[in-house]
């Protein structure tokens, strides 16, 4: 009580709580200064699109409904109780009956939707004015405010006497529960506070609006409906208090504000939240999770209102208990929730994630809320939440940039598929003339786009990316029978394997296993390796094995993990051991190709196919080696694999001609350095491997993360194209096959794939 008294006195004495009610003005100022950053840019441009749409709308008004309240005054707000429907046993359907959790579409014909449209438009326009300083947005917002609240011919009477009526009951008068309809005014007033600095919103407008809300506040405090709502024991009472405090804040009624704040913990929180965090009144509903989150969100709103006072209300520990009770079900299926939730599970899960993020802003000691929110929140960057509350990190910005590019690329791909009449064509790189190079599903690069789309879904949780990933993944299914390719790991694990990891769906698992069976047919135990290319004359090579093939072993390791059949694992280990024995030089660098005598497995020669010369250091090949042996250690914990990965890393970063940004030249022995082409794909592969390697090597973890962080940062800052260019690829400056004069200094899809994987692993390493 002493702490509450202090808070009340503090608020009363200083009389200077900031003008904003829930929004944080310093945060908005920070956003305004960084609108060029990808996350904010996407949210901002969507906001402006909505504001432009609002400019074209006529101001909503209560006078537009085609039905009048029982009072006979069309200025009286009128809405239907959401869950009440006509009684099918009565000829006239009266009185309506309750179907809890089922919304009656009739409510759309009255004032509720118009109130929502108006408050949303005012908030949108106010934010658009704040971020752009363009008076047209403020003028439209003020027009809507005047129409709804001030102009005599169109204004709403300051009451909710006919809110949420139940036709056929109580003379069609409103119910106390109807006061929840006006909760939308709370956030709208944040927009109003922003408009106070505009030219359009005059001092008379401010005076008139405050007069309206003073009368509305008085009605809430003295009317039968208001008093009954105040006596409720669930989210309605919470929402009632938040509204009273917000309107008192706006109108300068300190007495009411202080009184309600001083009683809130005792009257609302202690009566609604059990010691273990359960909210019994909400848990009895058919939408128990949703209403529990709804009430929690209202309480957080109140804590944000008082945040600007520099104090905290006493109830934070109990509020956190309520959050903790719900948070344990984030990421789980609805059937794991022990109460009812007949619909809207995913939406309410996301709403809770946003609430947890706001709770973290109120108490930075609860970093677990931040981690949980960032792990599960749907990153639909157009969501206003990302403008009003979210503080994005570098990974958020990188994925937001990737979203812009990949949406653009999917448009380009779809157009070309129609032109070429082949729905299975996949994007690989950019041609010399700037056009998009498309390849068939048999190309070793065909699976990377699907993998990128799955990683976009993994990070954002946006269903759009899952839909795109599913569609593009199944186009590759026939590859599971493709015994002519050693690259089934690239083609099928980076698509179907990632899909199975993220979804657990049996259909993806089945394809992965068949692809592994097919890949295993390319293994010859006399050589101890999986054969790479099937093409090539005997004078060129008899049984070529390339370092790239290390990457395909993941498919085999996974097949054994999923089935318990050691056959695939044994092949992978044999291949890794033989490659480790024959592919590496004493300094830890690797050859590109080793040619074997197929009859006895003896080495015929060590050469290159994509490097500058046989003894050169082809950069992407070193990346395959580092990544491949790190991955092998993950599955086997064989220290020899860890040692090989370390040794190649040590060699790699000892290169005297390594650029300062750690994005290598395509071949580190090219005499044209520093004018030689770079290879961003090699950098992305190595960075991704380093994040994983750091988790296995405590001694060098800090060094490996330092290297990986630097590479990731430089790829983000200096190797990305302008949005809507480069055919939608994410990275510039990769090199495919320099000796063949093909794909030199261009965007390539595998660079993008390992770049996104790098970002995901970086985010995980921070946790």
Task: Report residues per predicted region.
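A glycine-biased, small/acidic residue-tolerant capping/turn segment at secondary-structure junctions
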Residues: 334-343, 719-738
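A beta-strand-loop signature enriched in Asp, Gly, Thr, and Trp
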Residues: 264-290, 297-325, 639-704
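Short linear capping/connector segments at secondary-structure termini
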Residues: 161-170, 280, 427-434, 473, ...
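Aromatic (Trp/Tyr) and acidic
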Residues: 80-83, 87-114, 171, 306, ...
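Alpha-helical junction/boundary sensor with strong preference for TPR arrays
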Residues: 132, 152, 224, 268, ...
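Extracellular glycan-targeting catalytic surfaces
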Residues: 18-226, 262-265, 303, 307, ...
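Active-site cradle of extracellular carbohydrate-active enzymes
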Residues: 156, 160-163, 175-290, 586-608, ...
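Bacterial Sec-dependent N-terminal signal peptides
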Residues: 1-20
């Amino acid at each position: 009580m002493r702490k509450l008294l202090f808070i009340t006195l503090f608020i009363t004495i200083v009389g200077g709580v900031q003008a904003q009610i829930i929004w944080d003005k310093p945060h908005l100022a920070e956003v305004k200064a960084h609108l060029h950053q990808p996350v904010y840019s996407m949210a901002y441009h969507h906001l402006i699109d909505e504001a432009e749409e609002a400019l074209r709308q006529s101001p909503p008004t209560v006078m537009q409904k085609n039905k009048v309240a029982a009072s006979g005054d069309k200025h009286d707000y009128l809405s239907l109780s959401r869950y009440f429907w006509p009684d099918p046993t009565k000829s006239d359907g009266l009185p309506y009956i309750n179907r809890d959790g089922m919304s009656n579409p009739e409510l759309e014909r009255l004032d509720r939707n118009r109130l929502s449209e108006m408050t949303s438009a005012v908030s949108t326009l106010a934010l658009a004015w704040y971020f752009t300083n363009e008076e047209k947005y403020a003028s439209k917002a003020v027009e809507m405010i005047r129409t709804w609240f001030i102009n005599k011919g169109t204004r709403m009477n300051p009451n909710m006497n006919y809110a949420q009526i139940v036709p056929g009951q109580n003379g069609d008068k409103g119910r106390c529960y109807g006061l929840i309809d006006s909760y939308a005014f709370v956030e709208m007033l944040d927009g109003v506070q922003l408009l106070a600095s505009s030219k359009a919103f005059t001092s008379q407008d401010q005076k008139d609006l405050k007069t309206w809300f003073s009368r509305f506040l008085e009605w809430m405090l003295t009317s039968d409906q208001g008093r009954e709502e105040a006596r409720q024991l669930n989210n309605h009472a919470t929402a009632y208090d938040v509204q009273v405090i917000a309107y008192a804040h706006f109108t300068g009624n300190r007495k009411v504000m202080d009184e309600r704040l001083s009683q809130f913990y005792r009257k609302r929180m202690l009566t609604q939240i059990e010691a273990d965090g359960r909210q019994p009144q909400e848990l009895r509903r058919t939408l128990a999770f949703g209403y529990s989150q709804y009430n929690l969100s209202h309480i957080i709103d109140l804590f944000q209102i008082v945040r600007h006072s520099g104090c905290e209300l006493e109830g934070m520990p109990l509020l956190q208990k309520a959050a903790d009770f719900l948070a344990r079900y984030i990421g789980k299926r609805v059937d794991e929730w022990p109460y009812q939730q007949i619909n809207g599970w995913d939406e309410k899960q996301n709403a809770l994630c946003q609430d947890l993020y706001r709770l973290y802003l109120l108490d930075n000691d609860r970093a677990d809320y931040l981690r949980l929110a960032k792990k599960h929140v749907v990153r639909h960057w157009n969501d206003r939440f990302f403008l009003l509350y979210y503080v994005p990190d570098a990974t958020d910005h990188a994925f937001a940039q990737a979203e812009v590019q990949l949406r653009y690329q999917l448009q380009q791909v779809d157009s070309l598929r129609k032109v070429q009449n082949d729905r299975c064509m996949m994007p690989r790189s950019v041609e010399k003339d700037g056009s998009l190079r498309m390849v068939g599903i048999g190309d070793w690069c065909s699976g990377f786009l699907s993998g990128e789309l799955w990683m976009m879904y993994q990070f954002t949780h946006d269903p759009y990316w899952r839909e795109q990933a599913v569609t593009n993944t199944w186009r590759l299914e026939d590859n599971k029978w493709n015994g002519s390719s050693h690259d089934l790991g690239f083609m099928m694990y980076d698509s179907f394997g990632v899909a199975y990891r993220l979804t657990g769906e049996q259909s993806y698992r089945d394809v992965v296993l068949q692809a592994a069976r097919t890949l295993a047919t390319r293994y010859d135990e006399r050589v101890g390796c999986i054969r790479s290319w099937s093409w090539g004359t005997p004078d060129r090579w008899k049984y070529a094995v390339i370092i790239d093939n290390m990457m395909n072993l993941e498919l085999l390791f996974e097949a054994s993990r999923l089935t318990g059949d050691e056959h695939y694992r044994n092949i992978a280990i044999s291949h890794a051991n033989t490659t480790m024995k024959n592919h590496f030089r004493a300094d830890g660098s690797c050859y590109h190709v080793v040619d074997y005598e197929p009859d006895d497995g003896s080495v015929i020669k060590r050469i290159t196919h994509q490097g500058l010369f046989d003894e050169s250091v082809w950069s992407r090949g070193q990346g395959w080696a580092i990544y491949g042996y790190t991955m092998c250690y993950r599955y086997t914990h064989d220290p020899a694999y860890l040692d090989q990965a370390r040794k190649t890393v040590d060699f790699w970063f000892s290169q005297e001609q390594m650029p300062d940004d750690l994005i290598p030249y395509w071949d580190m022995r090219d005499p044209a350095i520093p004018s030689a082409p770079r290879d961003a794909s090699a950098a992305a592969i190595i960075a991704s491997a380093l994040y994983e390697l750091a988790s296995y090597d405590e001694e060098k973890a800090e060094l490996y993360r330092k290297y990986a962080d630097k590479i990731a940062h430089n790829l983000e800052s200096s190797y990305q194209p302008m949005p809507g260019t480069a055919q939608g690829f994410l990275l510039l400056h990769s090199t495919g096959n320099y000796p063949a004069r093909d794909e030199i200094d261009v965007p390539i899809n595998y660079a993008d794939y390992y770049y996104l994987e790098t970002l995901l692993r970086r985010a995980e390493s921070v946790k």
